[in-house]
Regions:
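Catalytic metal-binding/acid-base residues of hydrolase active sites
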Residues: 23, 57, 84, 133, ...
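Generic structural signal for hydrophobic
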Residues: 8-9, 17, 71, 98, ...
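Extended substrate/RNA-proximal surfaces in nucleic-acid metabolism proteins
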Residues: 28-129, 137-140, 196-203
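Mid-to-C-terminal alpha-helical segments outside catalytic/metal-binding sites
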Residues: 173-203
């Protein structure tokens, strides 16, 4: 529940949280407006900025551009695409389609190619370093390539329940575990803040 997730985030000291449930063509028009409604209800009542969004999941690459556009039209201020994680059989070409569509974040992009890293940088699409088990097995590759070629990185919890929320210390450890030096960690947090600020301007 968004209310519970936000309450737990507030108790953990979060300043902002994106509510980005998994969506596809079957539920996007139901989920996003309801998350938007919940975020509006909480505004001014909680010490956390609540950003309504969506994670477009297992969509054929050919549909992703229209789905990103449709999600924004429904009120999603933060649009994520479920990338080519090694933990699931995500269709090849999803990473490229997400970048072309101008998603805010490409989640767990797996063994992302150099070409897609460069394109993500060009399109200002951030790549996710994830704290979630399974999806995180390619964190090292994503981090190494992003640092080498200058792509933006964010750290995400990929929370599916309130227990998945992590502390700042845990986030730092996940980043260091991916091979990101301490001197770059602040840049990752700054990118996350910038994305949230941009998303809040869409509300």
């Amino acid at each position: 529940l968004p209310f519970e997730l936000v309450r737990r985030a507030a108790a953990a000291g979060y300043k902002a949280i994106g509510i980005t449930d998994h969506v596809d063509a079957s539920n996007m028009d139901l989920v996003i407006p309801r998350v938007v409604k919940a975020a509006k209800k909480l505004k001014g009542l909680v010490p956390v900025e609540v950003v309504p969004g969506a994670e477009i999941t297992h969509a054929p690459p050919e549909l992703i551009k229209d789905m990103v556009k449709g999600a924004r039209e429904l009120g999603a201020c933060l649009v994520i695409v479920h990338g080519e994680t090694l933990a699931e059989p995500v269709q090849e070409g999803t990473n490229r389609a997400a970048i072309e569509a101008g998603a805010d974040i490409l989640a767990h992009p797996g063994l992302i190619s150099i070409e897609d890293i460069l394109y993500a940088n060009e399109k200002s699409v951030a790549l996710e370093i994830t704290a979630r088990k399974g999806h995180s097995i390619s964190n090292g590759h994503v981090a190494q390539m992003a640092v080498k070629f200058g792509a933006q990185l964010v750290i995400n919890t990929d929370s599916h329940s309130p227990d998945d929320l992590i502390t700042k210390e845990r986030a730092e450890n996940v980043l260091m575990g991916a091979g990101i030096g301490r001197e770059r960690i602040s840049l990752v947090f700054e990118t996350s803040r910038n994305i949230i600020e941009k998303a809040l301007r869409r509300i």
